[in-house]
Amino acid sequence: TDADILTILKTDLMVSSSALDTYLQTLIASAKDYISTEGITLADSQSDGMLVEMYAAYLYRRRREENVQMPRMLRWALNNRLFSEKGAVNG
């Protein structure tokens, strides 16, 4: 659920206050949108929840720091998720 993703995201970003919750929830929604533009249909699974969390954390860090590139781990996870989905549809 989005609440679970928010909890994990806050832990990842070392945010303990609820002051940023609305902003972080917006990043979670944006991450889902960006992932869907990659051609991925998200499921209600733990692995897809972690994919959304990783993407939301990347969006947060990108806004806070200069020259933040998409982490290779995230790009790898997106590619693997897309290929597994397309393989299941076409296979």
Where are the model-predicted features located?
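Conserved short "hinge" loops at termini or chain/domain junctions
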Residues: 1-51, 61-65, 81-91
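Contiguous, low-complexity intrinsically disordered segments that are highly enriched
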Residues: 67-77
